[in-house]
Amino acid sequence: MTRLISADKSEDDLLEASLRPRALSDYVGQEKAKGNLGLFIDAARGRGEALDHVLLYGPPGLGKTTLANIIACEMGVNIKSTSGPVIERPGDLAAILTNLEAHDVLFIDEIHRLSHVVEEILYPAMEDFQLDIIIGQGPSARTIKLDLPKFTLVGATTRAGLLSSPLRDRFGVISRLEFYTHDELAFIITRSARIFGMAIAPEGAMELARRSRGTPRIANRLLRRVRDFAQVRADGVITRAVADQALALLEIDEMGFDMMDRAILLTIIDKFGGGPVGLDTIAAAISEESDTIEDVYEPFLIQNGFLNRTPRGRVATAAAYSHFGRIAPEPPQGKLF
């Protein structure tokens, strides 16, 4: 079952293509990253050169793919999109690289999942715009260098720490994408509603924004589900009351928590005295994979102050207790002797 407020892509998100802006001036939020990219793009265009390689990292659903497409549009070049898991062999990467034209953009999503062997092929391609090809086998094998057109690699990752240092060091532009503010999300939701021909009140857009976990992909997904509710059980207009009723039906609370978020926090609070408790123990208690908890659920809980990671395990914060109407335990007092 697909998690409604997961920031990962789903089939339902294919509609996102029609919502994506095509110019930096239309892109909402990420002002620091947007400002830097605009400067570097203008400079590269002025010199008639390819833009330096770009690494975009941050939680899923914040607009990394959109920015990659905007870079290509602003540079006036083509974009070839792929992902790390798809490029299984060096030959797969070689086929992609040799089909690029001068100044084209190659977008690799989930670039942290490239194999070490494929990375080795990518290094000279990024640095020297050359492809090392081995001809023959055994003692008679030899390497020839194939020149490549100067291109821009745009890599996207949710786990920058998993990138090898040699790969990370070859990116000239590195930008971190942050969670969006409520005002930015409300603007995005209003724009999406206009494109889809939906009627939405400002307070309805803000209510959706508050529960979208700072993520445009989640905001657009919730908008489509609330639209269905408004169409069937209301007069078609998404007001704050309609949004509140629809989200209550979907079991998404005022913080944007769903059942799994609540299960994680309540497990720590009720079963393990607020923590610290190990990740594997939490995973076993709620029947979920440890990696899924760490990569999908925890970032939002930690960034919003509901969960702490400590060397001894996960700890529920006072904000988590307050959210569920519980009284947080007093911190232990240190002994004098």
UniProtKB/Swiss-Prot annotation:
Residues 1-180 are annotated as: Large ATPase domain (RuvB-L). DNA binds at residues 309, 314. Keywords: ATP-binding, Cytoplasm, DNA damage, DNA recombination, DNA repair, DNA-binding, Hydrolase, Nucleotide-binding. Mg(2+) binds at residue 65. Residues 254-337 are annotated as: Head domain (RuvB-H). GO terms for molecular function: ATP binding; ATP hydrolysis activity; four-way junction DNA binding; four-way junction helicase activity. Residues 181-251 are annotated as: Small ATPAse domain (RuvB-S). InterPro entries: AAA+_ATPase (IPR003593), AAA_lid_4 (IPR041445), DNA_helicase_Holl-junc_RuvB (IPR004605), P-loop_NTPase (IPR027417), RuvB-like_N (IPR008824), RuvB_C (IPR008823), WH-like_DNA-bd_sf (IPR036388), WH_DNA-bd_sf (IPR036390). It catalyses: ATP + H2O = ADP + phosphate + H(+). ATP binds at residues 19-20, 61, 64-66, 127-129, 170, 180, 217. The lineage of its organism: Bacteria, Pseudomonadati, Thermodesulfobacteriota, Desulfuromonadia, Geobacterales. It is found in: Cytoplasm. One of its GO terms (cellular component) is cytoplasm. It comes from the Bacteria. This is Holliday junction branch migration complex subunit RuvB. The RuvA-RuvB-RuvC complex processes Holliday junction (HJ) DNA during genetic recombination and DNA repair, while the RuvA-RuvB complex plays an important role in the rescue of blocked DNA replication forks via replication fork reversal (RFR). RuvA specifically binds to HJ cruciform DNA, conferring on it an open structure. The RuvB hexamer acts as an ATP-dependent pump, pulling dsDNA into and through the RuvAB complex. RuvB forms 2 homohexamers on either side of HJ DNA bound by 1 or 2 RuvA tetramers; 4 subunits per hexamer contact DNA at a time. It holds the Pfam family AAA_lid_4. One of its GO terms (biological process) is DNA recombination. Homohexamer. Forms an RuvA(8)-RuvB(12)-Holliday junction (HJ) complex. HJ DNA is sandwiched between 2 RuvA tetramers; dsDNA enters through RuvA and exits via RuvB. An RuvB hexamer assembles on each DNA strand where it exits the tetramer. Each RuvB hexamer is contacted by two RuvA subunits (via domain III) on 2 adjacent RuvB subunits; this complex drives branch migration. In the full resolvosome a probable DNA-RuvA(4)-RuvB(12)-RuvC(2) complex forms which resolves the HJ. It comes from Geobacter sp. (strain M21). Has 3 domains, the large (RuvB-L) and small ATPase (RuvB-S) domains and the C-terminal head (RuvB-H) domain. The head domain binds DNA, while the ATPase domains jointly bind ATP, ADP or are empty depending on the state of the subunit in the translocation cycle. During a single DNA translocation step the structure of each domain remains the same, but their relative positions change. Its EC number is 3.6.4.-. Its main location: cytoplasm.
